[in-house]
């Protein structure tokens, strides 16, 4: 909390990682998507970027820190659109831009999205990670028109599951990105109770 009583907001877009840390995080994201967190060792990450396991450990003391950092850099891609939508008090154009970016990120990182939604280690870590919880609350408060009560939280969980499930489901693997994007945008608008 700040001295004024408002919640300190963790801005993912402002996180600073060194070049070495970014190499670890990028390699880890790909390996997590392929093998899951438990199936990815620090040695595998080290081998992927051509360094020793000790070099990876020097950048991040635990695999959990790598998981959190990797998720934060991905969510950082949404921070600018989220801030714009918050500044616009949830105006339709800003919300549409934010929703488009959420969908674009999900489509562009399909394998990772599946891992984020189903890997038990990631689910546990993010469930306990306050900055992630704050980010998701900010995101869905904007998308749901300023509400984040119990009903809104259930809607948010359903929408997140719907987007993540839709981009990774075997029924849509043959769809091109443009078709999937258009269908997903329209259906998500309905789930949000919005129409543009």
How would you describe each model-predicted region?
Residues 100-107, 118-121, 142-145:
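Helix-loop "lid/cap" segments that line or gate small-molecule binding pockets
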Residues 78, 106, 163-167:
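Hydrophobic recognition helices of helix-based DNA-binding modules
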Residues 85-89, 116, 120, 170, ...:
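Secondary-structure edge/capping motif, primarily at the C-terminal ends of alpha-helices
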Residues 23, 27, 31-65, 69:
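Helix-turn-helix
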Residues 65, 69, 80-114:
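Hydrophobic alpha-helical connector segments
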Residues 93, 113-114, 125-196:
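Hydrophobic/aromatic-rich alpha-helical bundle segments in the mid-to-C-terminal region
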Residues 1-19, 30, 147, 173, ...:
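N-terminal intrinsically disordered/low-complexity leader segments
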């Amino acid at each position: 909390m700040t001295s004024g009583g408002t919640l300190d907001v963790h801005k993912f877009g402002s996180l600073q990682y060194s070049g070495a840390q970014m190499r670890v995080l990028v390699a880890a994201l790909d390996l997590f998507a392929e093998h899951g967190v438990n199936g990815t060792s620090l040695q595998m990450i080290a081998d992927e970027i051509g360094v020793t396991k000790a070099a990876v450990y020097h950048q991040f003391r635990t695999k959990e820190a790598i998981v959190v950092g990797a998720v934060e850099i991905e969510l950082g891609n949404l921070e600018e659109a989220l801030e714009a939508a918050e500044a616009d008090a949830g105006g339709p154009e800003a919300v549409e831009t934010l929703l488009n970016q959420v969908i674009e990120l999900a489509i562009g990182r399909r394998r990772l999205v599946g891992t984020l939604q189903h890997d038990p280690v990631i689910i546990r870590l993010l469930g306990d990670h306050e900055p992630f919880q704050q980010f998701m609350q900010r995101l869905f408060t904007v998308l749901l028109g300023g509400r984040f009560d119990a009903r809104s939280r259930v809607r948010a969980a359903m929408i997140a599951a719907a987007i993540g499930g839709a981009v990774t489901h075997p029924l849509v693997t043959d769809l091109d990105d443009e078709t999937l994007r258009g269908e997903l945008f329209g259906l998500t608008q309905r789930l949000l109770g919005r129409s543009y």
